[in-house]
A protein has these predicted regions:
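Residue-level signal for inorganic ion chemistry
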Residues: 45, 83, 105, 185, ...
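ALDH superfamily catalytic-core signature
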Residues: 239, 247-392, 455
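Terminal low-complexity tails and localization/encapsulation signals of metabolic enzymes
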Residues: 1-51, 85, 89, 138-164, ...
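Rossmann-like NAD(P) dinucleotide-binding subdomain of oxidoreductase/dehydrogenase enzymes
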Residues: 139-285, 412
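A short hydrophobic/small-residue beta-strand
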Residues: 187-189, 367, 452
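Short, well-ordered beta-strand elements within core beta-sheets of diverse protein domains
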Residues: 48-54, 71-75, 163, 274-278, ...
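Glycine-rich loop-to-alpha-helix module at the N-terminal edge of alpha/beta enzyme cores
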Residues: 48-138
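Conserved C-terminal structural/oligomerization subdomain of aldehyde/semialdehyde dehydrogenase
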Residues: 46-49, 237, 330, 357, ...
Length: 498
């Protein structure tokens, strides 16, 4: 299917059934108030479908269904082996429906179909399968105490988990939350972004088909200020887990404090530095990686390497290589398998990125590439790959998350200066350092205040590695066995023996 042509993908899109209803207690249904919102195709600005706009009334129904499912143990009370088998079946159904899920993802948020087929759809299924395998490998502990007692340390499911996920990787981010939450026995209410809700709605039906009991997995499309707020403030939600902007993350933490002090795990924004030292083992590979690290997924990536720090002694030749690779990233129709940069998710995001480009010009940064809207005849929301040089730490394009294909380049002389520049941010999600010197690699990776540090690569890793940030990039971790800890309570039981 990855060998389909643009015309073939367009034919499939024209005959695709688009999910549009909420999923509550095992059934698709309209919002209680009957309201809907428009789901727009970023590639052409046209209406895809109208989706149920849930609010507090729908949240109440979903929370009650999730709580009932948790209390009667229809999921958490199943033998681990059985839950594992059901989740494995869920993952397999996602794999069998890979083409549909990838197409929904591309149509809904504008990412290239090649990326949706090559990464998003398979990675989401792999996440569910990986967490399924972990279910019967979570062991409790016996504490070392005197012989007259038995001390147990056990983990139990939290209860009802509300997961609010972003629009840039809607399917993968949903599964990063859903996988470990289900694996540990919780009931889940998923609130996808109103900008890209379709894959979340589709996998709800696949979960039911796989055998996940009614009420255990619910999906509420709608807006953050309505249904999202209702979930965050609900007294019977035990955990709110979120990926999105730092601003909204802070608000959700406040909601936790104002309600029932529910667990609040926030994975937020980033302004990640990519440090290129003069002794990088392969400058061309580093330049190629640097282009991909900012332009992949239209730059709509929380870990995007949006700050490129290049040692001045190699900066001229490195920039020449970078520009050559950057010119290979051309904004085009997301359904064309050759496309590397698709459309921005909507008109609002496109305008925000264009504003930052103007800010960069006004601040005195040197525009080397791009900087314009493109493909306007399509009606879609496209921006050229953009590179600014001579960016100083005082500039807004150095400090603020743009969330688009805009790269800020800054020179430096020493490793110490690069680390200072790299850490000069409110965020701490990711960083990279390119060097052939092991001592510099270790020193740099230890000094950089980021949840993930890449050495001689960008965005390496798999499900075994935790993902999350330092500072205002959030708390808690997705992926790996550490993610399972977020969705459990730790219980101590002391048994006095005779």
């Amino acid at each position: 299917m990855s060998d389909l042509t643009l015309a073939q993908w367009q034919h499939k899109a024209a005959h695709l059934t688009l999910p549009s209803q909420a999923f509550i207690n095992g059934s698709y249904r309209d919002a209680v108030n009957g309201a809907t919102f428009d789901c727009i195709n970023p590639a052409n600005g046209k209406l895809l479908t109208k989706v149920a706009a849930c609010d507090a009334a729908d949240a109440e129904l979903a929370v009650q269904a999730a709580r009932d499912a948790f209390n009667d143990k229809r999921w958490s009370g199943l033998p681990p082996k059985q839950r594992k088998q059901i989740m494995q079946r869920f993952a397999e159904l996602m794999r069998l429906n890979k083409v549909e899920l990838a197409l929904l993802e591309s149509l809904d948020m504008g990412k290239p179909i090649g990326d949706a087929m090559g990464y998003d759809a398979p990675a989401a299924a792999n996440c569910i399968a990986w967490n399924a395998e972990a279910i019967d490998k979570i062991y409790d502990q016996v504490a070392p105490v005197e012989e007259s007692a038995l001390a147990l340390v056990t983990r139990e499911a939290l209860g009802v988990v509300a997961a609010i996920v972003p629009w840039n990787f809607p399917l993968v981010m949903a599964c990063w939350k859903l996988g470990p939450a289900l694996a540990t026995g919780n009931s889940v209410i998923l609130k996808p972004s109103e900008k890209s809700p379709l894959t979340a709605l589709r996998i709800a039906g696949l979960a039911k088909e796989a055998g996940i009991p009614d009420g255990v997995f619910n999906v509420l499309p709608g807006f953050g200020h309505t249904v999202g707020e209702a979930l965050a403030m609900h007294m019977d939600v035990d955990c709110i887990t979120f990926t999105g902007s730092t601003k909204i993350g802070k608000h959700l933490v406040e909601c936790s404090g104002k309600s029932n002090l529910k667990r609040a795990f926030m994975e937020c924004g980033g302004k990640s530095p990519n440090i290129i030292l003069a002794d990088a083992p392969d400058l061309d590979a580093a330049a190629k990686s640097a282009a991909g690290a900012i332009f992949y997924n239209q730059g709509e990536v929380c870990t995007a390497a949006s700050r490129l720090l290049v040692q001045n002694s190699i900066k001229p030749q490195f920039m020449e290589r970078l520009l050559a690779h950057a010119r290979e990233w051309i904004s085009a129709n997301p359904l064309d398998p050759a496309t590397r940069i698709g459309a921005m998710v909507d008109h609002i995001q496109m305008e925000q990125v264009l504003r930052y480009i103007e800010i960069g010009k006004q601040e005195g940064a040197k525009l080397l590439l791009g900087g314009n809207r493109t493909n306007m005849e399509s009606g879609g929301f496209y921006i050229e790959p953009t590179i600014f040089d001579d960016v100083t730490p005082q500039m807004r394009i150095f400090r603020e998350e743009i969330f688009g294909p805009v790269l800020a380049v800054t020179g430096f002389d020493t490793l110490e200066e690069a680390i200072t520049l790299g850490n000069d941010t409110d965020y701490g999600l990711a960083a990279a350092i390119w060097t052939a010197d092991l001592n510099k690699a270790v020193k740099g990776s230890r000094a950089l205040r980021a949840g993930t540090v890449f050495v001689n690569n960008w965005d390496g890793g798999d499900m075994t590695m935790p993902f999350g940030g330092f500072k205002q990039s959030g708390n808690g971790r997705d992926k790996s066995l550490h993610a399972l800890e977020k969705y459990t309570e730790l219980k101590s039981t002391w048994i006095q023996l005779e």
